Curated annotation (Swiss-Prot):
Pfam families: ASL_C2 (PF14698), Lyase_1 (PF00206). GO terms for cellular component: cytosol. It catalyses: 2-(N(omega)-L-arginino)succinate = fumarate + L-arginine. Its main location: cytoplasm. SUPFAM superfamilies: L-aspartase-like. It comes from Hydrogenovibrio crunogenus (strain DSM 25203 / XCL-2) (Thiomicrospira crunogena). It is an enzyme of class 4 (lyase). GO terms for molecular function: argininosuccinate lyase activity. This is Argininosuccinate lyase. Its EC number is 4.3.2.1. The lineage of its organism: Bacteria, Pseudomonadati, Pseudomonadota, Gammaproteobacteria, Thiotrichales. GO terms for biological process: arginine biosynthetic process via ornithine; L-arginine biosynthetic process. Belongs to the lyase 1 family. Argininosuccinate lyase subfamily.
Length: 462
């Protein structure tokens, strides 16, 4: 970054001495808010068109401003822009460069506008753009989950509670659980976008402006759905950024839980899945290692988003109306949250459909831990026992199985009948893994038929 301390500071006339060099650096935000240059220029072009519409700028002045802003953007994208800490932020840097290019007309651009409503508009435009980039990637992840779920709709695996074997489920059913969670995350983000897409421009510093602005026209140019209806609120609140970060924290929480399973399942102890080599790394000392770095990093990065959410909440919690310099601290947490979501999302969307399932291992694991015990209890209920009595009978049978090393399906009929006389040879139909999953044939159940129907509904929605 070039520090042009010889450049006149655009807001310096009121002061009797120059700003301390360290204070200039300490209070500047250009180091990070320059990423919003497109949105700042987009907002300025719309503002200039509105100023022309209401008679504040003539036709030539409007042309000069738009041409100048296009040149500024071209210079930025070509790496020719000399960013100045002396000009503090993205807004003043662009205005100073514009004035350098087109002269005094550049100084008219800020008429009827403050940096307070300008930055609030920039952030909303930036976040709207990022949301619009994130949503298709979330759909890509959903498609990837559906591909894997469809491929493994009949693959049997153990379902867990407390990370202990509970009941058999299908791998496809398990994947569809993640699909449902991410579907709600998509809905949260779409809902968040509605509130992000509100235009504060025209609020000026805090009280509005005396100029005859037409906010509706500016909003139309910038494709905002709504206009903020209170100028104090428009410039001072960052609840929309908090809401996005809350979405991100929830979404990353889901990806972190998913990651935890992928890390466990890819271990030699589980051996349920294999992650393709391109999503893993090796060890510098142990030549046999294949480390699941992608899910581990996503799991780790979740914590930083939690931190950003708390940072933004804490930033806003004690601010009186309207704008305060504290709000400069909203951008780095928001920007890093956006980057973390996009990176984690891309990694998962690439990785999930490429996961290879070890069907023999998942089936063998489902046969352990008496996973069909509940099916035996349900069988006894259908024979007339109250569920609590059936629960007790099966508990005794499981205890016997632990002592003898036999699964329920491996016990002779006579052994099972010793626990209750109503048991007949039809019991073995319900004690198979296939029988167990197929019996749960209802909306939301793990039966392959229901899993395939759920996948079809999901595809239709997407």
């Amino acid at each position: 970054m070039s520090n042009q301390h010889n450049q006149e500071k655009l807001s310096s006339a009121r002061f009797s001495e120059a700003t301390d060099a360290f204070v200039e650096e300490f209070t500047a935000s250009i180091q990070f808010d320059k990423r919003m240059y497109r949105q700042d220029i987009q907002g300025s072009v719309a503002h200039a068109k509105m100023l022309h519409k209401v008679g504040i700028l003539d036709k030539q002045e409007l042309k000069d401003i738009i041409d100048g802003l296009e040149k500024v953007q071209s210079d930025i994208e070509a790496g020719k822009m000399n960013w100045s800490i002396k000009q503090e932020d993205i807004h003043m840097n662009i205005e100073a460069k514009l004035t350098e290019l087109i002269g005094i007309t550049g100084k008219k651009l800020h008429t009827g506008r403050s940096r307070n409503d300008q930055v609030a508009t920039d952030i909303r435009l930036y976040l709207r753009d990022e949301i619009d980039a994130i949503l298709p990637e979330m759909a890509r992840l959903q498609h990837g989950i559906l591909l894997l779920a469809e491929k493994e709709a009949e693959t049997i695996m153990p379902g867990f509670t407390h990370l202990q074997t509970a009941q058999p489920v299908t791998f496809g059913h398990h994947m569809m659980a993640w699909f449902e969670m991410i579907k709600r995350d998509v809905e949260r983000l779409e809902d968040c976008r509605k509130r992000v897409n509100t235009m504060p421009l025209g609020s000026a510093a805090l009280a509005g402006t005396t100029y005859p602005i037409q906010r509706e026209y500016t909003a139309e140019l910038l494709q905002f759905d709504r206009i903020s209806e209170n100028s104090l609120d428009g410039v001072s609140d960052r609840d929309f950024a908090i809401e996005f970060t809350a979405f991100a924290a929830t979404f990353l929480m889901h990806l972190s839980r998913f990651s935890e399973e992928l890390v466990l399942w890819s271990s030699a102890q589980f051996n349920f899945i294999d992650l393709p080599d391109r999503f893993c790394t090796g060890s510098s000392i142990m030549p046999q290692k294949k480390n699941p770095d992608v899910p581990e990093l996503v799991r780790g990065k979740t914590g930083r988003v939690y931190g950003h959410l708390m940072s933004l909440l804490t930033l806003m919690k004690s601010q009186p109306l309207a704008y305060n310099k504290d709000n400069q601290e909203d951008k780095e947490p928001l920007f890093d949250t956006v980057d973390t979501v996009k990176g984690s999302l891309r990694a998962f969307a690439d990785m999930v459909p490429a996961i290879i399932v070890n069907r023999e291992a998942t089936y063998a694991a489902a046969k352990q831990g008496f996973s069909t015990a509940t099916d035996l209890a349900d069988y006894l209920v259908n024979k007339g026992l109250p569920f609590r009595d059936a629960h007790e009978v099966v508990g005794l049978a499981v205890a016997h199985g632990i002592q003898t090393g036999q699964d329920l399906s491996e016990m002779p009929l006579e052994t099972l009948q010793a626990f209750h006389s109503s048991i007949t040879d039809d019991v073995f139909e319900v004690l198979t893994l296939e029988g167990s999953v197929s019996a749960r044939d209802h909306l939301g159940g793990t039966a392959p038929k229901q899993v395939k129907a759920a996948i079809k509904r999901a595809k239709d929605r997407l």
